[in-house]
From Swiss-Prot:
<comment type="function">
    <text>Transcriptional regulator involved in several developmental processes during embryonic and imaginal disks development. Involved in determining dorsal cell fate. Acts as an essential transcriptional regulator of proneural achaete-scute complex (AS-C) and is required for its spatial regulation during development of the adult peripheral nervous system, and hence for the positioning of neural precursors. It is the only factor to directly activate AS-C genes.</text>
</comment>
<dbReference type="Pfam" id="PF00320">
    <property type="entry name" value="GATA"/>
</dbReference>
<keyword id="KW-0539">Nucleus</keyword>
<dbReference type="GO" id="GO:0007350">
    <property type="term" value="P:blastoderm segmentation"/>
</dbReference>
<dbReference type="GO" id="GO:0035051">
    <property type="term" value="P:cardiocyte differentiation"/>
</dbReference>
<feature type="compositionally biased region" description="Low complexity">
    <location>
        <begin position="345"/>
        <end position="360"/>
    </location>
</feature>
<dbReference type="GO" id="GO:0048542">
    <property type="term" value="P:lymph gland development"/>
</dbReference>
<feature type="compositionally biased region" description="Polar residues">
    <location>
        <begin position="329"/>
        <end position="338"/>
    </location>
</feature>
<keyword id="KW-0479">Metal-binding</keyword>
<feature type="compositionally biased region" description="Gly residues">
    <location>
        <begin position="284"/>
        <end position="294"/>
    </location>
</feature>
<keyword id="KW-0805">Transcription regulation</keyword>
<keyword id="KW-0010">Activator</keyword>
<dbReference type="GO" id="GO:0035050">
    <property type="term" value="P:embryonic heart tube development"/>
</dbReference>
<dbReference type="GO" id="GO:0042440">
    <property type="term" value="P:pigment metabolic process"/>
</dbReference>
<feature type="region of interest" description="Disordered">
    <location>
        <begin position="376"/>
        <end position="456"/>
    </location>
</feature>
<dbReference type="InterPro" id="IPR039355">
    <property type="entry name" value="Transcription_factor_GATA"/>
</dbReference>
<keyword id="KW-0862">Zinc</keyword>
Length: 540
């Protein structure tokens, strides 16, 4: 921006021409009007000039403040050699040192006369481009005169503490503080002493008392001494059985040993022990020793829940497999007992049935803690089977197979044959409740078996053995592909045939009892399984 140049006759004229400019038009021309404000410079004329704002095409002179008189007489900006760019069309803009207007409110008249608003630029540019040190330092001294600065600043009292004479706290003698305060008499206090005096009504103590001194003075009482050792300093005063005061050491010694503490053990100083940081694992170790049974149960339930939440299929496989082994063993023993005592009375069989149902319910309730939804489904199936067993007049020999299906939670069937009838007994499986294999192979319980029931005695044994096949294959229905033996498992039809179960175990008794009946029906069941598998493949 161009600046109006003065002739340099009087200092007041140079300062008065820098007050406030009046801008007109589209910011292309700036009319600078200034009047003489001093009586000593009344002869000076008012200068009005029009110059270009950013780049002056006529004159490229950017002289500032008290330029030399020869510059004014010789022409604008001609006699000032090396001051600024001398080219007419200078591509580089050289800013002036005009400051913001609001500086005058804080830094007095000297700064206000040397301050000018730069329209079109949001920052104030200092004149650091000039090699003329005299002109630059002269303007700097006039702009930041210490007398005018301290005289006109509204923060004079605050600045006086920082740059003026030093202050000292009358209480602690501090010479530097974030905030100086005054007491009631007008003396200066540091921030800490002032706040302490304001809160407590007394001067802040200068010396912190020793911790040992505080404990000694706090526990020392006038005319109080230990009746055993005679000491007057202790961490805790106690009383003996007679009510006399004793020190902490003598009191504890008498409490532990039942005799007075010997005088030879007296020490002048108070013996203190070094405290070790408390370990968090010590309490848990003691608790584990006392309540190991409860802790192990809780840990088992917690692990069961975590596995069920993270990997429900994996946890289902682990727990259901072990559950099937125990249920199959109990079911096998009960079936052998019932078959051995087939000639027993009806009432005894019903009592045994009720007892076994109670045992199954207890096992299911324990297993339901980990799998509540699965336990509910199994409980509903047990109730349905209980209704079937109450309505049927015979077929008590099917109890073991029924309980095996209830424990596995896979299949329900209706024994509709009576002891003297020749009606057909259809074994139906609920496909909605029968899970599929984890690899996508359909469950073996989708294959329905129909055999004609009559008065033949081997149907009881065959039914028990046949449903034991299903209980063994039910392991695969849980998502675990269990291959008992390569000779007994049909991979094409997904079923077991034969009389042995290999690794599943617990079926030796049933195998020995079933024997020939299972082998007789193996061919028929195999053919029927092929037909059912073909139907399932076609529908799926």
């Amino acid at each position: 921006m161009g600046i109006l140049l003065s002739d340099g006759d009087s200092t007041s004229d140079q300062q008065s021409t820098r007050d406030y400019p009046h801008f007109s038009g589209d910011y292309q021309n700036v009319t600078l009007s200034a009047a003489s404000a001093s009586t000593s410079a009344s002869a000076s004329a008012t200068h009005v000039a029009a110059v270009k704002m950013y780049h002056s095409s006529a004159v490229a002179a950017y002289t500032d403040l008290a330029a030399a008189g020869s510059a004014a007489s010789a022409g604008v900006g001609v006699g000032v050699s090396g001051y600024h760019q001398q080219a007419v069309n200078a591509p580089v803009y050289v800013p002036s040192n005009r400051q913001y207007n609001h500086v005058a409110a804080h830094f007095g008249s000297a700064a206000a006369q040397n301050a000018w608003t730069t329209e079109g630029f949001g920052s104030a540019h200092a004149q650091f481009y000039s090699p003329n040190a005299a002109v630059m330092m002269g303007s700097w001294r006039s702009a930041y005169d210490p007398s005018g600065f301290q005289r006109s600043s509204p923060y004079e009292s605050a600045m006086d503490f920082q740059f003026g004479e030093g202050r000292e706290c009358v209480n602690c003698g501090a010479i530097s503080t974030p905030l100086w305060r005054r007491d009631g008499t007008g003396h200066y206090l540091c921030n800490a002493c002032g706040l302490y005096h304001k809160m407590n009504g007394m001067n802040r103590p200068l010396i912190k008392p020793s911790k040992r001194l505080v404990s000694a003075t706090a526990t020392r009482r006038m005319g109080l001494c230990c009746t055993n050792c005679g000491t007057r300093t202790t961490t805790l005063w106690r009383r003996n059985n007679d009510g006399e005061p004793v020190c902490n050491a003598c009191g504890l010694y008498y409490k532990l040993h039942g005799v007075n503490r010997p005088l030879a053990m007296r020490k002048d100083g108070i013996q203190t022990r070094k405290r070790k940081p408390k370990k968090t694992g010590s309490g848990s170790a003691v608790g584990a020793g006392t309540g190991s049974g409860t802790g192990s149960t809780l840990e088992a339930i917690k692990e069961c829940k975590e596995e069920h939440d993270l990997k429900p299929s994996l946890s289902l496989e682990r727990h259901s497999l072990s559950k099937l082994h125990t249920d199959m063993k109990s079911g096998t023993s009960s079936s052998s007992t019932l078959m051995g005592h087939h000639s027993a009375q009806q009432q005894q069989q019903q009592q045994q049935q009720q007892q076994q149902q109670q045992q199954q319910q207890q096992q299911q309730s324990a297993h339901q803690q980990c799998f509540p939804l699965y336990g509910q489904t199994t409980t509903q199936q047990q109730h349905q089977q209980h209704g079937h067993s109450m309505t049927s007049s015979s077929g008590q020999a099917h109890l073991s197979a029924r309980h095996l299906h209830g424990a596995a939670g896979t299949q329900l069937y209706t024994p509709g044959s009576s002891s003297g009838g020749g009606s057909a007994s259809a074994y139906t499986s609920h496909s909605a409740e029968t899970p599929a294999l984890s690899n996508g192979t359909p469950s073996p319980h989708y294959q329905h078996h129909h055999h004609l029931g009559g008065t033949h005695g081997h149907h009881v044994t065959a039914a028990a053995a046949h449903h034991h096949f299903h209980a063994a294959a039910a392991v695969a229905a849980y998502g675990v592909k269990t291959e008992a033996s390569a000779t007994n498992y049909d991979y094409v039809n997904n079923c077991y045939f034969g009389g042995t179960f290999g690794a599943l175990g617990g079926a030796a008794t049933t195998t020995a009892m079933a024997g020939g009946a299972a082998s007789e029906l193996a061919g028929y069941h195999h053919q029927h399984n092929v037909i059912q598998a073909a139907k399932l493949m076609a529908t799926s």
